[in-house]
Amino acid sequence: MTAFLIRSIIAALCLTLIVLPAQAIRETDSYDGNIFALYAGNGSLVPPAVTLADSLQAGRTSVIVYYLDDSRTSKAFSPAVSELQRLWGNSVDLLPLTTDALQGRADSDRTDPAHYWHGIIPQVVVIDGDGKVLLDEEGQVPLEQINSAISQATGLPAPQGESMSLSFNELNTEVISR
């Protein structure tokens, strides 16, 4: 009887210790973690290296991307943000910002990211070195449109050709410009 109880307890412990695999699904509004690491293969995008205030003060081109980690539209757009970093590198300040901290907050001035946010995600704002907004679009903004605004802001040529998405598994998609 004692042996049976011990075996039963061990079996119950083994069953409770079995960990189910984590599941991340791009087509849901569930929180899966850092969307850039998970869906774009680029966890280096967040947190941004500089603030909007620092970028504007330095006279650099700022590219703000408003997103939420638990939004299917943000998950789908994350590879495009990663591609922007690949294309423009150190020529622009790329600022992917989650909107959680902006909700219900009044904007103060043009150095505050809340000043530009409309309440829709994803949203892309391109601001040139003089503080002029060259692009302010919501949704799945085409990469070519963003590249054109960045080119106008920086004076650097935009990549030629169209972008295309390559999906190499059920989670990751890569956007490339050709």
Where are the language model's segments positioned?
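Bacterial N-terminal signal peptides
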Residues: S8-I18
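Thioredoxin-like thiol-disulfide oxidoreductase module
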Residues: S82, D93-V133, L143-Q145, I150-T154
